[in-house]
Amino acid sequence: MASLGGDNSQAEGAEVRHVPVLIAEVIDALKPAPGAVIVDGTFGAGGYTRRILETGADVIAIDRDPTAIEAGRAMEKEFPGRLNLVESRFSALDEAVARMSGAGKKVDGVVLDIGVSSMQIDEAERGFSFQKDGPLDMRMSSRGSSAADAVNRLKTGDLARIFNFLGEERHAGRIARMIEKRRAAKPFTRTLDLANAIETLVGRNPKDRIHPATRVFQALRVYVNDELGELARALLAAERILKPGGRLVVVTFHSLEDRMVKRFFADRAGGSAGSRHMPETHMRLPSFTPAVKGAVGPTPEEEERNPRARSAKLRAGIRTENSPLEDDLSLFGLPKLPETNELARS
């Protein structure tokens, strides 16, 4: 269930080709056209952005990873005046649009690919992979607390909650207690050190397709980068900046994120009941209508060609003329976890 999505890279001689997941389905749902302005909130290796630019639309591409932005400069030159790269969190995509196009500017589409780029997974020094030895980092950018900070400084109960909720790890408590005992003697600093310790503790069933550390590494990455909070705020920001008729397309790679997107579109289409924050007596006009039926997955051919696409799901909505609804983060049911910015000071 690891969230290993995004652009898939393959070496072809000296050149690297990037194969984005569900690209045909994304373009079909997004419907970019010449002269349209599309926000790619998760630029990564630029796979979606390139295909959108090839339709004649202009792109504002956002990524919090400065390495991705720097790698995209060549594409910026290839499409002069039509691609604007912005180093930013995608939760602030409305601010990025205002910076590039002016306050109050609306756009024709937003696409979000909620997964880790294979470029990040494949770079051992980024610390995302339990299959390659590297520093226990996992940050999308160089700012903020690292996975090592979380593993070595969080309370055992907090670690267990993170592993359980963000990784759906059934051995969460046992792993958290093992970490507490081990770090007292020697802090965890390397990816393989943590991965091997987890494998030694819980064992490895030959029938299991995934490594025993998969869910813990996923949980730490999601926690360190506040990925669920980022997604929630990005969905609300997209609602604010889309024109009537504009399209929001979101690709997710595991169930936590997909449930959030599904809940958002259901709520914005008027499919949810009232809550204590928004009573049923309050008339709410829908801000989105469905652009696709349910969730769209990869074809068998794409799964065969790109195994990382197997867990991908696409959901999409079309912005109505009604005003954005309330920015209510409680809609997403996010857990209360320790703030990552407190770790470096603890």
From Swiss-Prot:
GO BP: rRNA base methylation
Q: Name one GO molecular function term.
A: rRNA (cytosine-N4-)-methyltransferase activity
Q: Give the domain of life.
A: Bacteria
What does the UniProt entry say about where the protein is found?
Cytoplasm
Q: What catalytic activity does the UniProt entry give for this protein? A: cytidine(1402) in 16S rRNA + S-adenosyl-L-methionine = N(4)-methylcytidine(1402) in 16S rRNA + S-adenosyl-L-homocysteine + H(+)
Presence of keyword Calcium:
no
The EC number of this protein is 2.1.1.199
Q: Which GO terms describe its cellular component?
A: cytoplasm
Residue numbers spanned by region Disordered: 270-327
Q: Which UniProt keywords apply?
A: Cytoplasm, Methyltransferase, rRNA processing, S-adenosyl-L-methionine, Transferase
Chain sites annotated for binding S-adenosyl-L-methionine: G46, G47, Y48, D63, F90, D113, Q120
- Protein purpose: Specifically methylates the N4 position of cytidine in position 1402 (C1402) of 16S rRNA.
Q: Which family does it belong to?
A: Belongs to the methyltransferase superfamily. RsmH family.
HAMAP family attached to this UniProt entry: 16SrRNA_methyltr_H
PANTHER family, per database record: 12S RRNA N4-METHYLCYTIDINE METHYLTRANSFERASE, S-ADENOSYL-METHYLTRANSFERASE MRAW
Protein name in the entry? Ribosomal RNA small subunit methyltransferase H
**Species of origin:** Brucella ovis (strain ATCC 25840 / 63/290 / NCTC 10512)
